Regions:
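Nucleotidyltransferase catalytic core that binds NTPs
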Residues: 1-183
C-alpha cells in the first residue's frame, strides 16, 4: 500500500511524512469526499499523517509552498511508476520561482516510484487502482473490492469503504442488476 510505503521510506530517512489526497469530489472518478478519503486512509494505516488538499492549498504546487514556508528544505515524493517523470519535471520547473501557487525553494527534490509496475488483472493489492475498485463497486462485486483494499483493514471497515464509494457513485441495487444484465 502506498501509505505504508511512504511511512516506511520516511522512517528509514529519519524524515516526516505526509499523505496528500485530492480535494476533488465527483461521482465518476472521486466518489469519496475529501473528509472520507482522510478518514479511511487514516484508519487503514495507523500512525499515518493524511491531509486533503484545501481551497487555500488546492494543488501540489500550493502544498510545496506550504511545506517550504513550514521550514522544510528537502522533499521526496512517492508516486506510481507511470507518474515519476511528470512530477519530477513539474516540481523542478517551479523550484525557486514565485508564481500564483506561492514560492518554494528546496535544496533537493526527489520523486520516487512506489514499488514496481502495477500488475493489471492480478486481483490483489498489487493490481489495486481506484478505477478497478470503482468497477467492482459498479458491478456489485464486494468480494473483489475487498481483495484490493489494504490488508490491515477490518472487514467492517472494508464494508464501510465499499458503501461510501457506492453511495458517492450513486450506485444502487437496481443499477447493479441493470449493469449485470447489460454485460451478460
Amino acid at each position: 500500500m502506498v501509505v505504508k510505503h511512504v511511512m516506511d521510506a520516511a522512517k528509514k530517512e529519519g524524515a516526516d511524512h505526509k499523505i496528500l489526497t485530492t480535494g476533488s469530489h465527483d461521482a465518476k472518478k472521486n466518489p469519496l469526499t475529501p473528509e472520507q478519503k482522510v478518514k479511511h486512509l487514516s484508519r487503514a494505516v495507523k500512525g499515518s499523517h493524511v491531509e486533503a488538499m484545501t481551497k487555500e492549498h488546492p494543488t501540489l504546487l500550493h502544498q510545496m509552498s506550504k511545506l517550504h514556508k513550514a521550514g522544510y528544505t528537502h522533499v521526496t515524493m512517492h508516486v506510481g511508476s507511470d507518474r515519476v517523470h511528470e512530477f519530477h519535471k513539474l516540481l523542478h520547473q517551479y523550484n525557486g520561482t514565485e508564481n500564483k501557487h506561492g514560492h518554494y525553494n528546496f535544496k533537493s527534490i526527489k520523486v520516487k516510484s512506489v514499488g514496481g509496475e502495477r500488475k493489471e488483472g492480478g486481483g490483489g493489492i498489487e493490481s489495486a487502482s481506484g478505477t478497478a475498485m470503482r468497477k467492482h463497486v459498479t458491478a456489485g462485486d464486494k468480494e473483489s473490492f475487498h481483495k484490493m483494499a489494504p490488508s490491515g483493514m477490518s472487514k467492517a471497515h472494508k464494508d464501510e469503504l465499499y458503501h461510501d464509494v457506492r453511495k458517492g457513485m450513486g450506485v444502487n441495487e437496481s443499477f447493479i442488476v441493470r449493469f449485470k444484465n447489460w454485460i451478460s
